[in-house]
């Protein structure tokens, strides 16, 4: 087991994968902080995050604060006397009074090769923009008070046999790569065997939070652009186009598509209120 104490902040699957990698190398957090349970599904059943489930399964205390600045929560963190914090897709920015409680700082795994793709949607942004897999990867960095701005400890390029790929594929690939890189970097940082390197802020690029309407396609737009959007938004919000039914606009979700000889070819769709069908069948009935 590790000879240092750390608190882990994270919420989704990519964070749970990092916990698995840390555990495989003998590192378990003394505390986990994750998002509160959320209503999910048609029944709006209150559902814990995957990281909370991971913590419960491994007998690790879990906190689910609604406000990170709450004095009682900050007090709980202070009592732990952790050496270092680790953040993977937690979902909120840690305030300074929280960051100051970790003597060895706070490590963050960010799924892009910083300073490119700073922000909340780096995976989708890489699928939308990057021309080569050579520019796709993950970073382990130290957090500061600016978004994805702190110095870099280690980076690693993605291992993919083709490019571009759907965001869901990149999410899994970078989740695995990032988890291993984090597990490799954390003990090196705590022991003082690795030094941080400042980012070149002059080359930074930024990505925005994805909105539902980002998935709307104009089928007359550039074919490559539409195909990249189809790949980038395959998890959420998915790509769609509008079709008039009975004088009213109706959404048609694209479930399968390809870029063939420079043409964006739609293969399958789900018209609003109907089941998935071949695009040819949809056109016949449109």
Predicted segments, located by residue:
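N-terminal Rossmann-like dinucleotide-binding module
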Residues: 1-42
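A residue-level signal for conserved active-site and pocket-lining positions in enzyme catalytic cores
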Residues: 10, 32, 55, 85, ...
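N-terminal beta-loop-helix "entrance" segment that forms/cooperates
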Residues: 38-56
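Glycine-rich, highly charged phosphate/nucleotide-binding loops
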Residues: 63-72
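Short amphipathic alpha-helix with an adjacent loop that forms part of the alpha/beta core around
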Residues: 71-81
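An anion-binding loop in the catalytic cleft
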Residues: 214, 219-286
């Amino acid at each position: 087991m590790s000879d240092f104490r750390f608190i882990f902040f994270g919420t989704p699957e990519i964070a749970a994968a990092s916990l698995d990698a840390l555990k495989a190398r003998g590192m378990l957090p003394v505390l986990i902080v994750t998002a509160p349970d959320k209503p999910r599904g048609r029944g709006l059943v209150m559902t814990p995050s995957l990281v909370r489930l991971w913590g419960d399964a491994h007998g690790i205390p879990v906190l689910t604060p609604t406000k990170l600045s709450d004095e009682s929560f900050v007090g709980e963190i202070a009592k732990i006397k952790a050496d270092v914090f680790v953040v993977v897709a937690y979902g909120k920015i840690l305030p300074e009074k929280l960051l100051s409680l970790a003597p060895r700082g706070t490590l963050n795994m960010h799924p892009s090769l910083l300073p490119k793709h700073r922000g909340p949607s780096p995976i989708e942004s890489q699928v939308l923009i990057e021309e080569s897999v050579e520019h796709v990867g993950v970073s382990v960095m130290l957090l500061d008070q600016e978004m994805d701005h702190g110095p870099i400890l280690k980076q690693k390029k993605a291992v993919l046999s083709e490019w571009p790929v759907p965001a869901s594929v990149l999410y899994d690939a970078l989740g695995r790569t990032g988890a291993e890189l984090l597990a490799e970097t954390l003990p090196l940082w705590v022991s003082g065997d690795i030094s941080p390197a400042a980012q070149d802020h002059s080359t930074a690029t930024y990505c925005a939070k994805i909105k539902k309407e980002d998935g709307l396609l104009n089928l007359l737009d550039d074919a490559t652009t539409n195909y990249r959007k189809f790949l980038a938004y395959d998890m959420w919000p998915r790509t769609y186009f509008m079709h008039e039914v009975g004088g009213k606009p109706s959404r048609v979700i694209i479930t399968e598509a390809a870029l063939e000889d420079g043409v964006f070819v739609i293969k399958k769709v789900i018209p609003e209120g109907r089941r998935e069908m071949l695009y040819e069948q949809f056109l016949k009935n449109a």
